[in-house]
Amino acid sequence: MAMKKRILENRGSWNNRHANKKKPDEAVSKLPATIPTDIDGKRAYIEAWANENRIPGKIQSYFTVPVKPESCDWRILSQHLAKGNRVLSIEGPFKGAKPPKLVLDVDSQIRKPHLAKFRGSILQIWFRATGDGRFGIAVQNILHSAEATREFKTFLEYLEREHSGDVLCCHQIRVRPVQTFDPAHPAPGSHIEFRKGFGSRHIPIGGTDQKYNILDWTPACKAPWIGLSKRIREMIHPARGDRFLECFAGPAYIAESLSKDFEDCFAADVRLLERQTPGIRYLHAPIDKEFFPKFFRGKSKEGKWTVYLDPPDGKALAGGVIPEISACHPERIVLNTSNLAVATQEIKRFRREGYMLRKIVPIELSPGNPTIQALLLFVPDRAGLLGRGEERRGKVIRARENEKTGNETDSKPILFRQKGRR
């Protein structure tokens, strides 16, 4: 019995030795905890990210454009303090930016005694920049009294009289349910309507012929955004007969800017907002896994395609999107990402679907902010470099057989709608 007892004890101690054996420490990221704000620090950060995660693809030169405060969006925001008090404060595009004269003048004007009721109604004032020193203004306020309404009209007269050269329009907007509106992060289910004001709701984009709605999403700093389309053209080298699709398009500036370099250009976004995009065909649809098979179905969609993806806030693409895009075999896929952790996972997902990362172009769209943004160019792995033995087909997208394509004409826009979405 004593021998059996010792055997059992030894057996138990053997199991305990395995159970208590220390596991090797998990890999700890050596990247700095915070992203630097200067361009040299960002360049070093993205190189360290690529080395640490063994990211393939060539890192090209950083895309930067000098930024002036008058070419950026600004905001005067009403903030709540203790005991129900509120204060109006100026918010800029990046830390240390000096407000342009228009913003300072408006901030000073609304603090005058004869506009007290109007000032008390303000939730925020957006200064949407054109990129060439001019602005469109959107005032979100709640006019509860006739006196506040009269003072708002007085404010409009002030803008037309004193700032006719740099203010193209000013509109009051009302948001239901009541909440602070942000063009970059519109609340789902919110309803926005224009009320009183003057001028067009669409303002120019720099010196181009293109325009955007003052409620639409754009980067805060317009100068880098305006020059981005040229950098994308240099990155992908479009050939004659190629076609282009911009997803999460907003005002579709990229697609319109590149329309002369492609045979056809399309843009898609889920937001139903009035837009002026005469050079392209605009689709209102959610960018999900159902969108791409539906879009590429039909004879009119044959050819070599470049798909440009710019998901908001650095978010990952919706589930199933990458396999569906890859199944349509576009010639190029360009992903604009502002989240390197998400980008690492997206690169792996594209690899699994047979698309290899060819180029990395860091872009500086938010100067002075602790953010890193990059364009990632993916191309089909036709040479089998990813270790897959099968032949990579689909150099040219072809119409799927045995499917009804419907009648499509260039004169009619194509609308994709989903139940329950506006």
Explain the meaning of each model-derived region.
Residues A255, A318, A343-T344:
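Short, well-ordered alpha-helical microsegments
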Residues I322-A327, R332-L377:
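C-terminal substrate-binding/active-site "lid" region of AdoMet-derived donor-dependent transferases
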Residues M1-E246, A255-L309, S326, P330, ...:
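Non-catalytic accessory regions of SAM-dependent methyltransferases
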Residues K315, A341-V342, G384:
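Glycine-rich nucleotide phosphate-binding loop and flanking beta-alpha elements
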Residues K315-P323:
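A short, conserved alpha-helix within the catalytic core of class I
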Residues P312:
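Switch II (G3) loop of P-loop NTPases
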Residues G250-P251:
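Conserved glycine-rich SAM-binding loop
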